Regions:
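Catalytic cores of glycan-processing enzymes that make or break glycosidic bonds
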Residues: 1-180
Length: 180
């Protein structure tokens, strides 16, 4: 009924424990799946690669209920190291903090995804610039479902007017998005 009531695309939040029939039903109804690199649908892999996302999907770095990439990077050192070596293909020890170069690399992985849509949280875009991003990466978190005092209280630390004045940054973002 929902699909027939609108001309809008539908996207299903098919994350976590979903019945085995869900992917086939979504595909048959052309409902876009949600593909998150840190939440692979295949239980045999640690990470999903954006290059493997199906066309009928929205590829993103996370949801409002997850840590943004910079905070996630510091959650579990072993997981970060594995991601750095396996998903990024970089050798050596992963930096303790996510650098703008790492954030940009991950964004690029998503931008080249075959997914119909790539929708990235603003926090990830700000992470590519060491001067613009917020110093406290944990302040970028939108929602913590387990904490009734931390819900939807994210506020961007820079105004839109200020961001629009960052010509070099905006040109950089335009170059990154030009591949889509």
């Amino acid at each position: 009924a929902l699909i027939n009531a609108t001309h809008m695309l539908c996207c299903g939040e098919d994350l976590g424990m979903v019945p085995a029939c869900v992917p086939d039903v979504m595909h048959r109804l052309q409902i876009l799946s949600l593909e998150i690199q840190r939440m692979p649908k295949d239980p045999n892999v640690a990470f999903a690669h954006p290059a493997n996302a199906p066309y009928l999907s929205v590829c993103t770095t996370g949801t409002h209920d997850m840590n943004p990439l910079r905070a996630w990077w510091e959650e579990d050192r072993a997981v970060t190291q594995r991601f750095y070596n396996e998903q990024m293909g970089w050798q050596g020890e992963a930096p303790r903090e996510m650098t703008p170069e790492i954030a940009e690399f991950i964004i690029n992985q998503h931008m080249y995804s075959p997914a119909m849509w790539v929708i990235l949280p603003l926090q990830e875009w700000l992470a590519i610039d060491g001067k613009i991003r917020i110093p406290d990466q944990h302040a970028d978190r939108i929602n913590v479902p387990a904490d009734p005092h931390h819900f939807w209280n994210y506020r961007m630390h820079i105004t839109l007017e200020e961001l629009l004045q960052k010509d070099e940054y905006n040109a950089h973002v335009r170059r990154l998005t030009a591949v889509r």
